[in-house]
Amino acid sequence: MRLAYVTETYPPEINGVALTVDRFVRGLRTRGHAVDLVRPRQPHESECESRSEWRSPGIPLPMYRDLRIGLPLISRLTKRWSVSRPQLVHVATEGPLGWAAIRAARTIGVPVTSDFRTNFDQYSEHYGFGWLRGIVGGYLKHFHNATDRTFVPTLALSKALT
């Protein structure tokens, strides 16, 4: 199977999502799947645009400087996937790059799946942005309901999207 895997976080970043995505991508490739990894380029990394990976331009998050979010370059993704069409686009994170991936996949008629693992709306209170909780929760619902399927680890998280 040929699939595109889109994430805002990937090693050398060290966090649960980055490490899980890395294991998943390596596992798919080991099993013979062609995986086009799309992720933001880190400051110390060179540009990379090959058949198996694209490091998109990105910007650092203000409160998490070690993490860069990808710019929402819909037309660039649409062109990339029109040339080398995946059978499926999977979006692991809900940032601008993930949203662009959903839009690009829809433009060329490729099915899209996503992961919902982190309640960022609940995190907003922890970081002093509790007033954003409803907005963030609404965005997460909108994001995941724009995909064909969303993978969740618990029934409670599934219900949070309805």
Each model region followed by its residue ranges:
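An amphipathic, basic-hydrophobic alpha-helix
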Residues: P60-V91, P96-R103, T107, G134, ...
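Short, hinge-like loop/turn segments at secondary-structure boundaries
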Residues: S52-P57, T107-G109, F129-R133
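N-terminal subdomain of nucleotide-sugar transferases
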Residues: M1-P57
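Receiver (REC) domain switch-region micro-motif
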Residues: L3, V89, T150
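Helix-loop-beta element that forms the nucleotide-linked donor phosphate-binding surface
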Residues: S158-T162
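Nucleotide-sugar donor phosphate/pyrophosphate-binding loop at the beta->alpha transition
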Residues: P111-T113, F120-H142, A146, F151-V152
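A generic structural signal for well-ordered alpha-helical segments
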Residues: L28, A101-A105, F143-H144
